[in-house]
Regions:
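Classical eukaryotic N-terminal signal peptides for Sec-dependent ER targeting/secretion
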Residues: 1-6
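N-terminal signal peptide
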Residues: 10-21
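A structural motif
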Residues: 19-302
């Protein structure tokens, strides 16, 4: 009950914020957690949060360990019941003196102070942790201690409400029409889900695919402002670190894809539950076998 209430209390205005945190326990993680870092040996690390000392603290989970780890009171503490972050976001460099706009809250102190999701390199690892804006300090769970840091990356929202038919400033095109017109990643509520699709500013149209059709959307859209790498896949494959763009009617995640079709590079979705990928094109929901999936970019380890 505590964790369910927390989702409602801390969720942002994003279309899919209620899906961002999923319950977990020692020995098992949700099916599609969002990778946020790694151990020195390359093992991925994920963002965790748990009720702790009358607050909700943010930490890390290593899938090879039993439980998650929370930094609090100078100590790295293990917890057996927790939630794992399964949403999206962009990592922005920051310091303890300046929190960037759109920072994602993930927890709170006992006095209600919000805690924000951060990560930082430490002894060859990239470790998720928390930032307290009152103390102006970041904290990581590492080596049995609560490690204090002053320089880190903050997770910020990478979906923003779309006003009109122009992409937000500074957003790069992710695809193109056969005539070369750029296409941008958007998403919109459809049925009981939220579906990724495409925006064509040249003709002022926004489309998602749903129920066998290409559906033109005129309201309620969000634009993707993040970035990543495109990884080739086919036949229902989902590469590690795939970025979720929404969810289907049954709650299954939908990943952001693009595929070559009719001379263009079109944007769409991939549903791992059905093993199928689709793009909206020519009034139809077109199934594609070969596609590229947008995944998080971690850069070099060090």
């Amino acid at each position: 009950m505590i964790l369910i209430a927390l989702v409602l209390m801390l969720s942002s205005a994003s279309l899919v914020s209620a899906q961002d945190w999923q319950p977990a326990a020692a020995g098992g993680l949700p099916q599609w957690p969002t990778p946020a870092g790694y151990e020195a040996d390359g093992t991925p690390l994920y963002i965790a949060r748990a009720p702790f000392n009358r607050g909700v603290q943010i930490g890390k989970v290593n899938p090879t360990h039993a439980g998650a780890y929370i930094p609090w009171g100078g100590v790295e503490s293990s917890v057996s019941a927790f939630e794992v972050y399964c949403g999206s976001g962009a990592w922005v460099p920051a310091t303890a003196a300046a929190l960037p706009p759109g920072a994602v809250p993930g927890g709170k102190e006992a006095d209600g102070t919000p805690l924000y999701i951060i990560r930082a390199p430490l002894e060859g690892s990239l470790v998720p942790g928390k930032f307290n804006p009152v103390f102006h300090k970041g904290y990581l769970p590492y080596g049995g201690k609560e490690q204090e840091i002053q320089s880190f990356e903050v997770l910020v929202q990478d979906w923003v409400p779309l006003a009109g038919v122009q992409p937000p400033p500074g957003v790069a095109a992710a695809g193109f029409e056969a005539n070369g017109a750029p296409l941008y990643i958007v998403r919109a509520p459809m049925g009981n889900g939220v579906h990724p699709g495409k925006l064509n500013p040249a003709n002022g149209r926004e489309y998602v695919s749903y129920g066998g059709r290409e559906v033109e959307m005129t309201s309620g859209l969000e634009a993707f402002t993040g970035s990543g790498d495109w990884v080739a896949a086919a036949d229902g494959e989902v590469p590690f670190g795939a970025i979720k763009g929404g969810y289907d009617d049954d709650g299954s995640p939908l990943f952001i894809i693009r595929a070559r079709y009719q001379g263009g590079m079109h944007l769409g979705k991939m549903n791992p539950a059905s093993g199928k990928a689709y793009i909206p094109y020519g009034g139809q929901e077109v199934e594609v076998v070969a596609y590229e999936v947008l995944v998080y970019h971690f850069g070099a380890r060090g």
